[in-house]
């Protein structure tokens, strides 16, 4: 007997767009000499004493086993000829904005998951195109023609399957999963490829002898709930291609922040205040992008000895004004006890967010 009823809405048309090695691809586009070479977005460990992590890398670098979140030192050891680029996140944000404008030509129901991926519900799209595959192809064409980058697309009747489909054929692939093909598609997938199933859950499933979607499909719902609690209910439905989570065009954000880690420690107050200013301006720009205002400003400081201090101030009025955010964050820093150790990391975050109110004029 099912603990929770099975409800499967197969009427929707969902596209998941995932840019191919986005940051590295932007760098290759802007510097064609990089094409065909292993490119890593991250600090060069030869210049940082081995510190730093890989933000992302291109497909050439991935051939050496390099991946996101790997230490830059290990990436260099795996591929000494890799080209390390610190990255230009303002440039990437600008390109991401271009791509989102392309999405909006087809539908307003867009849920960005990050700067380089998004879900689109094109069931009722602006152009009246019935085929989601056709829309996905048009988006791929528009992005290539106007932005000079490739993306992979997954098309299906829910977000879970669309995400798996976009990962299935990269780079520049397009995969369609119809409702009649979903079980076959899922059956062949390794369980670690299932979106939303983390490393610890994968290890636990392996301990149970579950390695593929086919294996998962054979497990009774109650057994999964006994082992995983409520998540067992989700696993049971994932194995059957069931997910009714809507594409949310306005994802709820609890905070917006910006922080930087410094290869060279900061000691001088002028340098520290300059970095606080940069972070404050970045936060203000992000608030503007997301049409949000905030009340609570948080400053995070990490010293050379890895001591981390976090302090917040709540304002009487909502704001997204860069100068005000900078002033308050600077005042917070001034209120901290002196620490002779250099600063390794600075971050500014705005919380207590609310949607922009039309009659409040608090722009940059």
From Swiss-Prot:
Q: Which cofactor does it need?
A: Mg(2+)
Instruction: Write the protein's name.
Output: DNA polymerase IV
Gene Ontology annotations for the cellular component aspect, listed alphabetically: cytosol
Write out the catalysed reaction.
DNA(n) + a 2'-deoxyribonucleoside 5'-triphosphate = DNA(n+1) + diphosphate
| Source species, domain of life | Bacteria
Q: How does it assemble?
A: Monomer.
Positions of Mg(2+) binding = 18, 116
């Amino acid at each position: 007997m099912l603990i929770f009823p099975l409800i499967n809405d197969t009427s929707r048309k969902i596209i998941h767009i995932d840019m191919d090695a986005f940051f590295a691809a932007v760098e290759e586009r802007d510097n064609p000499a990089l094409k065909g070479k292993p490119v890593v977005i991250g600090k060069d460990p030869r210049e940082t004493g081995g510190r730093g992590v890989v933000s992302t890398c291109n497909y050439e670098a991935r051939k050496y086993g390099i991946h996101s979140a790997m230490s830059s030192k290990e990436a260099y050891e795996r591929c000494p000829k890799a080209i390390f680029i610190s990255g230009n996140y303002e440039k990437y944000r600008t390109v991401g904005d271009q791509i989102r404008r392309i999405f909006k030509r087809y539908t307003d129901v867009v849920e960005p998951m990050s700067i380089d991926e998004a879900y689109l519900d094109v069931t009722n799209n602006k152009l009246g195109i019935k085929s989601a595959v056709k829309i996905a192809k048009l988006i791929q064409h528009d992005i290539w023609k106007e932005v000079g980058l490739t993306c992979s697309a997954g098309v299906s009747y829910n977000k879970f399957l669309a995400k798996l489909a976009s990962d299935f054929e990269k780079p520049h692939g397009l995969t369609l999963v119809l409702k009649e093909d979903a079980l076959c598609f899922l059956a062949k997938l390794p369980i670690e490829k299932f979106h939303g199933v983390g490393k610890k859950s994968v290890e636990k499933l392996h301990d149970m002898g579950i390695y593929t979607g086919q294996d998962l499909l054979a497990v009774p719902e109650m057994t999964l709930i006994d082992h995983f609690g409520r998540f067992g209910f989700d696993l049971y439905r994932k194995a059957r291609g069931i997910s009714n989570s809507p594409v949310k065009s306005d994802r709820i954000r609890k905070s917006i922040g910006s922080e930087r880690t410094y290869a060279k420690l900061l000691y001088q107050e002028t340098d520290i205040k300059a970095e606080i200013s940069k972070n404050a301006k970045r936060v203000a720009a992000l608030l503007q992008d997301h049409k949000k205002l905030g009340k609570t400003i948080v400053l995070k400081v990490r010293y050379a000895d890895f001591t981390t201090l976090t302090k917040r101030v709540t304002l009487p009025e909502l704001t997204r004004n860069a100068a005000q955010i900078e002033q308050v964050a600077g005042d917070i820093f001034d209120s901290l006890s002196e620490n002779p150790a250099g600063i390794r990391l600075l971050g500014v975050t705005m919380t207590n967010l609310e949607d922009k109110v039309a009659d409040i004029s608090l722009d940059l």
